[in-house]
C-alpha cells in the first residue's frame, strides 16, 4: 500500500518477488519512501537483510509478512483460493511466531510435490530442484511457472497459470491453510497488527467484508 513516503506491502525473492530485500529497499528509498515493510508470503527470512539495508539508507523498517489463509466468505463473482492477511511487527516478532511461520512455509513443499506429480502424469517432468532454484524462501506457484517456462512447457508465467497451475487448473493442488482467526491470534500474541491485503480482490462487498474482518479480529 503506497502513500508518498510509506510502503507497507512489498515482496522480494524470498517469496514471489524477483529482487533481493536490499534491492527492494533501495528502490523504495529512491522513490522517496521513509517507512518500509517487507511482506513476503509466509516467511520472515528476508527481514534481517531488509533491516540492514534500511539502516544504511536511513529508512524505518517494519517487519511484515503476508499470511496465506483460508477463504472466509465465498464470492459470487470471484473464486480466490485464499485470503491474504498482512501482519506488521513494529517492535519485532517473537520466536514462537517465527516458528509458526516456518510451519506454513514448510507446508508449501508437499503441495509443490503434488503439483509436480500432476504435471508428470500429464507428460511434463520437472525436478523440484528446478523450481526451488527460483525461490530464496517460500516455494510457490510463481516459481513453478518460471520453471515451466524454462522447460519450454509454456511461453510465459501467465500461460502457466491460465493453462496448468491456476485455481481449478489441471495441476492445481490445495494445501492446508490457517483460518484468519488463528493467524490473527498468532500475530496479536506476538505484539503485531493485522490488515487484509488487497480487499477488493476477493469479490466481497465492503459493507459485508468489514464487519466480517472485525468479527475475525483483524485490526
Predicted regions and their residues:
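An N-terminally biased module of ancient metal coordination in phosphate/nucleic-acid-related enzymes
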Residues: 1-81, 163-166, 170, 178, ...
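Divalent metal-binding pocket/active-site signature
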Residues: 17-18, 109-117, 122-205
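Alpha-helical scaffold segments that flank or form the walls of functional sites
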Residues: 23-35, 95-96, 102-118
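Generic hydrophobic/packing signal
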Residues: 65, 89-91, 123
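A broadly tuned preference for mixed-charge, low-complexity surface segments
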Residues: 57-69, 93-101, 134
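Active-site gating loops and adjacent loop-to-helix segments of metal-dependent hydrolytic enzymes
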Residues: 72-109, 146, 150-169
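Residue-level signal for threonine
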Residues: 12, 94, 140
